[in-house]
Amino acid sequence: MFSLGFCLSVAVPALAETILLTGATVHTVSGPTLAPGQVLIKDGKIVAVDKVIRTKADKVVKLDGRHLYPGLIAASTSLGLVEINAVRATRDASEVGEYTPDVESWVAVNPDSELIPVARANGITHFLPVPSGGIVAGQSGLMVADGWTIEDMTIKKAVALHIFWPGMELDTTPKEEFKDKSKWKSLEDQAKERREKIKALEDFFEEARAYAKAREAGGKNGLPSENVVPAWEAMLPYARSELPVMVHADNERQIKTAVQWAATNSFKIIVAGARDAWKVAGLLATNQVPVIFERIYNQASALSSTPARDTHRYDVYFTAPETLHQAGVKVILSEGLDGQAAATLRNLPYSAAQAVAFGLPEDEALKSITLYPAQVLGVADRLGSIEAGKEATLFAADGDILDLRSHVKRMWIAGREVNLENRHTRLYEKYRARPRAK
């Protein structure tokens, strides 16, 4: 009887109710900020956004003094795939092999991760878990930061294919100064190895295109049907330029080569990591390549807080988003994949705040973690801004979300209010209630 009752409670949806959020400063992102404004929600969708909405609602939520924002989107992260970086058993971000396009990151996400509620408590409602390892690492799907299972959490499968572009820098260290002399390579050997890796990647995509043509022609005009190969099947939408390829590249030469490769083959690409993207901002703008900049805090590499080169100013990566924006590049901010990035994803609003402090307009900074990732990931029809017709995924904070002192007080995902409790708040309450020494 208990099991039957439980199943029935899950199968029968809750009665739809109309909710009116009133009194808050509404940051629509796609339009003007309403101070104060009102948002009407019905069946999980935003029905109306205005200064005054004259209609009756089943429930009125007063948010006087609060700031209402659309849910933040982390466009490149290891959240859900990595729990404790020092514990191998909790790291499931990479697969064995150099070319694994059929890997699907969303099936590996741990819905019970303690890090997901922590990120959610600071306004992050959606995230893109990125597979890593090898050259073609696999595909990512967009997840919502709330749900019992991966099926609950996956809102869009196969968002992008991830390529970790081969290294393009040459090591000029003399052999006599090289630590492990057995691994030392001459400049000629390094250049040859680099060319071979790029050629292998180009050949891989050529084979994918050939497979796509064979699949289209199979069974027609007396031609035999092509045998289905999972890896090549996964490549079909990318070989046909239907879905974007996310190229993870930091070095200037890597980014240049990747953009030229994409332009030559008419591929849609997104550059992620993008440490040196500011150096080639014009090239990126000309080719309309969006950038996911991950180096505000993790600058040269994992957990590094200094620029990659001694000749760079201390603020080179703080000003990079503004440099890209001025050139006409669509800039998205994220915390990336390095080191403790999954645990520090909660700091996403503060990366945007740092960019504002060094020149990026505040409205652009807010778009870089809301509307722009929604557009690039193909979900702008339902996420990324507060406007009629979109999903009612938003949160109320007690101040500017780009201000370190602000706190998220309430959150709704698809019109349903979610719990903001997490491991951090539980520990806070636990130790706050500790008996004091007399």
Predicted features along the sequence, with ranges:
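Boundary at the C-terminal end of the N-terminal hydrophobic targeting segment
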Residues: A14-T18
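Bacterial N-terminal signal peptides
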Residues: M1-P13
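C-terminal cap of metal-dependent C-N hydrolases
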Residues: A24-H27, E387-Y431
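Histidine-rich, glycine-flanked metal-binding segment
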Residues: V26, S30-Y69, R88
